[in-house]
């Protein structure tokens, strides 16, 4: 029987009850992580939970969990639900309290829920590439926090779906930031470009992996801003995330990127990613 982790206990889905006064439900007052499972093992799980606790700290949320404890509960959940290929979703909110914008006084216990799901890797997207669109970035100014406030991302993703695309690559003015659920990269003249780490983007775990792979393959990796025009005239474009892995974008706003085919550097990064899965899953 499927199990869900809820506030310190492993329960069945039918027993997983959340209050209507939970601040995650009322205000989006919380954080989350999404962790990939390959061959029954957790991929880059330490990095994910370090970011999870950083996000908690940034919003003044004391979870009373260590990285090691979070990894242990995740392992139990994967084993209980017999997940071979899939993911864990975990979120923490500021807890249950009467509706008031300010933090609850006195403090209440955070609410933590985690669950698993099985799903295949995106083989078709990885092999053949996807269509993308560009859209103005209308999100808040703390995109470095992996918060539950995802309305801007949802609207961007829906815009992509409306135009038969898989991802929406966002921009503030003419400066490309990131995808609605991914980091974005332009590859030009053998160099990988991606937006620098600051409050405008999430420091994606797969982004960190790609940077390490680029170093291993001696591919120049520059963390600097670039424009929408630069992106559209790149030799290759990719987006990356826990679920998307290293996905090539072969068409943007209806126009092909370069010759409309998956490029050689993308293939190198995908090759390196496969090796990274083997060496960084526990």
From Swiss-Prot:
Segments traversing the membrane: none
Sequence positions that bind pyridoxal 5'-phosphate: 51, 178
Enzyme class: transferase
CDD domains: D-AAT_like
Cofactor(s) required for function per UniProt: pyridoxal 5'-phosphate
Gene3D superfamilies: 3.30.470.10, D-amino Acid Aminotransferase, subunit A, domain 2
GO molecular function terms attached to this record: D-alanine-2-oxoglutarate aminotransferase activity; pyridoxal phosphate binding
Residues found modified as N6-(pyridoxal phosphate)lysine: 146
Quaternary structure (record): Homodimer.
This protein's name: D-alanine aminotransferase
Species the sequence originates in: Staphylococcus aureus (strain Mu50 / ATCC 700699)
């Amino acid at each position: 029987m499927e199990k869900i982790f809820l506030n310190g206990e492993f329960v069945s889905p039918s027993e997983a009850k959340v209050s209507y006064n939970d601040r995650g439900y009322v205000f989006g007052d919380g954080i989350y992580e999404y962790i990939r499972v390959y061959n029954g093992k957790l991929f880059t799980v330490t990095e994910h939970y370090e970011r999870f606790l950083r996000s908690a700290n940034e919003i003044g949320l004391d979870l009373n969990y260590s990285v090691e404890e979070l990894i242990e509960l995740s392992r139990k959940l994967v084993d209980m639900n017999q997940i071979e290929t899939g993911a864990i979703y975990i979120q923490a909110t500021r807890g249950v309290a009467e509706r008031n914008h300010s933090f609850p006084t006195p403090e209440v216990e955070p609410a933590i829920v985690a669950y698993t799901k099985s799903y295949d890797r995106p083989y078709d997207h990885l092999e053949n590439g996807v269509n993308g669109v560009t859209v103005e970035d209308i999100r808040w100014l703390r995109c470095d926090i992996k918060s539950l406030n995802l309305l801007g991302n949802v609207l961007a993703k829906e815009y992509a779906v409306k135009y038969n695309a898989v991802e929406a690559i966002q921009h503030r003015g003419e400066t490309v930031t990131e995808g609605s659920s991914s980091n974005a990269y332009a590859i030009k003249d053998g160099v990988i470009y991606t937006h620098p780490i600051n409050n405008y983007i999430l420091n994606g775990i797969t982004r960190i992996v790609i940077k390490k792979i680029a170093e291993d393959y001696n591919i120049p990796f520059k963390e600097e801003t670039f424009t929408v025009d630069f992106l559209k005239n790149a030799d290759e474009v990719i987006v990356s995330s826990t679920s998307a892995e290293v996905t090539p974008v072969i068409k943007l706003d209806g126009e092909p990127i370069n010759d409309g085919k998956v490029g050689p550097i993308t293939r190198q990064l995908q090759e390196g990613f496969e090796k990274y899965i083997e060496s960084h899953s526990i």
